[in-house]
Amino acid sequence: METTMKKKGRVKATITSQKEEEGTVRKGPWTMEEDFILFNYILNHGEGLWNSVAKASGLKRTGKSCRLRWLNYLRPDVRRGNITEEEQLLIIQLHAKLGNRWSKIAKHLPGRTDNEIKNFWRTKIQRHMKVSSENMMNHQHHCSGNSQSSGMTTQGSSGKAIDTAESFSQAKTTTFNVVEQQSNENYWNVEDLWPVHLLNGDHHVI
């Protein structure tokens, strides 16, 4: 009976300890200080196991959070700035072949992350394609109604079809011209980290 009580006590203590540990995990946006700590730690020790990185570096973040922060923002080879028109066309071509296999698509765009490409596709390209498709359907319906009400000739109808094709071509061109300004003001770029790192003259984590 006493042994059972001790076991229950140990289990309860373990659960309590886990809950307390989970309660100390930071969530939300990363600070510049956290970026600097993670950057310097990986610079000196390498990536390794991310759960170990989170604990050894002293960051109160999960291993997954550290991994995503490094891969998507702090890696020296991460490409900065907006996605170019050339990259946009390549994404469209690759998506037609590979579908939503973002990691495979990212391999063809050096410096771009799979998460960045996925977000660009869903928020920019996919949205504009949907709007363009709806506009095209409305345009065709409008042209069809005008054709029936005015008793257009075959030759006139052919002319309208050509106009419709031209309009669709213009809409298609407009659809993919969706590269917009993307703000990186909330993040500390690696370009900001390096000067600080060099001025300190110290490779150790602060």
UniProtKB/Swiss-Prot annotation:
Superkingdom, taxonomy of origin: Eukaryota
Transmembrane segments: none
Main location: nucleus
Compartments it resides in: Nucleus
Disordered: region residues: 1-20, 138-162
Skewed-composition ranges (Low complexity): 144-159
Keywords of this entry: Activator, DNA-binding, Nucleus, Repeat, Transcription, Transcription regulation
Any one cellular-component term (Gene Ontology): nucleus
Record-annotated HTH myb-type domain positions: 22-74, 75-129
Name the record gives this protein: Transcription factor MYB57
Annotated organism of origin: Arabidopsis thaliana
Lineage: Eukaryota, Viridiplantae, Streptophyta, Embryophyta, Tracheophyta
